[in-house]
Amino acid sequence: MFRHLFATVFLLFSFVNADFMFSYDNKNEYIEPMSVNASLSATTYLYTYSQSGHHFSGPAYDGSYIDTYGCCSGQSGSCRNNPSCQCQVSVGPLPQGTYSLGNMMTFKGMQYSYELYPASSNNMCGRSGFLIHGGACSGNPSEGCIVIENESTRYKIKSGATLKVVS
């Protein structure tokens, strides 16, 4: 009984304080607070975004799983979601590589947005300033940022997590 109560208290606390988290595999396991640049193990909050697949996936902070298609990155036209255009500034998708997610914020009125911090090993092609944010992929909402239209999906993304961008 005490163990269940202990886990429930920590679970409720994790919704209030985003700096604390549980591993996806074991919700009773406490993980130390993380900074934005903290490295994460492969079993802890690893998201994947496929440029050409328009697909974002990974474990949500609440224990559910995010598996959403229809995301976009890059300006509309032949370069949107096109890996061969990733080095075209303000046109192509977010360059492939590994990123750390910043804290949840509001960007241009869109709640549940996250800054993306590239790993030093990424080839950024002289590009910077990427985010995950909302908007309608039917327009031109992105110069390379990842656009996830559904607000409740963005809300479930864990700040401080790692994102792997693949072709």
Question: Predicted segment positions?
Answer:
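Hydrophobic h-region of N-terminal signal peptides that target proteins for export
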Residues: 9-17
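Exported/periplasmic cell-wall-interacting domains
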Residues: 88, 92-98, 102-167
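Sec-dependent signal peptide cleavage junction
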Residues: 17-24
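A short, compositionally biased
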Residues: 17, 48-55, 109-111, 157-159
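Positively charged n-region of N-terminal signal peptides that target proteins for export
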Residues: 1-4
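Secreted/periplasmic proteins
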Residues: 24-98, 104-105, 135, 140-141
